[in-house]
Amino acid sequence: MHVLIKGAGVAGLTAAHELVARGAAVMVAERTHGFATAASWYAGGMLAPWCERESAEEAVLIRGAAAAGWWEAALPAGSVHRNGTLVVAPLRDAAELRRFASRTSGYRWIGAEEIVALEPALAGRFREALFFPEEAHLDPRRALSALRQGLEAQGVVFSGGGIEESRFDLTIDCTGAARIGEFKGLRGVRGEMLYLQTDEVSLSRPVRLLHPRIPLYIVPRGGGLFMCGATMIESDDDGPITARSLMELLNAAYTLHPALAEARLVETGTGVRPAFADNLPRVTRQNNAITVNGLYRHGFLLSPALAEEVAALALGAELKRGNAR
């Protein structure tokens, strides 16, 4: 089978990976060079189905539970870090920690001593926390690049356009936010993030700081680089980060650790997450066209399950019930 995939973000690349593994001949079409226009480029890369369950449907937990294993198999060794997730809150916001715990599972309560054992940099900062030991994280930019390189090594062609779709048996649309206004019910959720660089703080895992209005996550990228995010604004505006969002993210980072106030601000970015009303993704087929969209803030977490669903739909295989919609 000859398949054309439109879109080289995380949804398109994972779908290509699954189809190639099943023997399909795949071409990927992407209008822009590189990944910088894809929401995937600005993602946190947290494979955190239990943390996401706090605000998401159970389907996100079920479909995302196997994501870390999928990425480990697809990427070079050491790309996925299985160090868990730490969720903390300032003393004044302790109620937020209990509210978070009441809405999910897969965690254990830990005290100040164990917090320090996990993250020495947070010594004396928090009295209690939630630790999610089964969660993981990866660097989205390295993951996207490695996935593309692996596909190219297997003969997948990446094209910038000018493709005659009639040449293909099947077309798969993974263009995400580009379909807002064309795909019924699809909306944009703006997400702003930043990168900080410092040698004064060291973290081994994603840390989520709870706040009634400005929750923060900070994800270590290695070498003193930290990704901090992310706002969630009901808008499809992909313009530069606003002064307000920048201030709020930096204030939250300072609350997590004062040394971050002296960190270098090396990058800011904005991505538009495509989402439906229920914030769950959809895979649909009409004749020889499949559409994958609505991954919202769960791109790296849910794309493996969606890719398997796409491959099964494309090739007529029976999908394991755990990944079915």
Show which residues each predicted segment covers:
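Active-site substrate-recognition segment that forms the wall
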Residues: 17-18, 47, 79-81, 177-287
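N-terminal Rossmann-like FAD-binding beta1-loop-alpha1 element of flavoenzymes
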Residues: 2-27
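Dinucleotide-binding Rossmann-like beta1-alpha1 core, especially the glycine-rich loop
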Residues: 44-118
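Glycine-rich FAD pyrophosphate-binding loop
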Residues: 20-40
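C-terminal catalytic lobe of FAD-dependent flavoproteins
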Residues: 263-325
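Short hydrophobic core segments
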Residues: 6, 167-177, 307
